[in-house]
Amino acid sequence: TVTHDQDEALSMASRIAVMNKGDIAQLAEPSDLYEHPANRFVADFIGSVNIFEGKLTVDEPEQAMVDCPELGRVFLNHGVTGAHETTVWVAIRPEKITMLPAGRAKAKDSPSGTNIAQGQIKGMSYLGDVTIYDIRLDSGRSIRVSRPNLSRWDQEEFSWDDKVSLHWHPSSPVVLLS
């Protein structure tokens, strides 16, 4: 079956082919496409994603580090198998980012100074089950964060122009080599 409806494809298919200019960019199970995209095209095509350019500074079997000028230092609890000191892209899904009032975020399971960013809420979209936040990072770059509305009052916790801290687990980002 051919479809352009991502929700339909992800829910019905056991394998999905993502095409780019007539070529298969990736053929995989739906969860693999979403959680482990092969490249920036697939990451951006499937769902919503924040992508930041950086330099791979550490790449060992159990850990990796990417320095992203617009996001900060990103620690991963697994290796990347890329060339050390090369340009890579860090992809992180909006739902994998935790948002707290400014100064309260602490990246668990990560070295100090990694997997954390500061910013200010510049947009909010209440969608019923989730609220989507557009955050302007201190670097000036925007990042999207989604939070489930677990109770009727969750949406009141944050408002426009609030300063916030963001953090993410070291297994959440995906490093893309192309």
Report residues per predicted region.
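Internal alpha/beta loop-helix hairpins
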Residues: 3-72, 95
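Non-catalytic connector elements of ABC transporters
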Residues: 49, 58-178
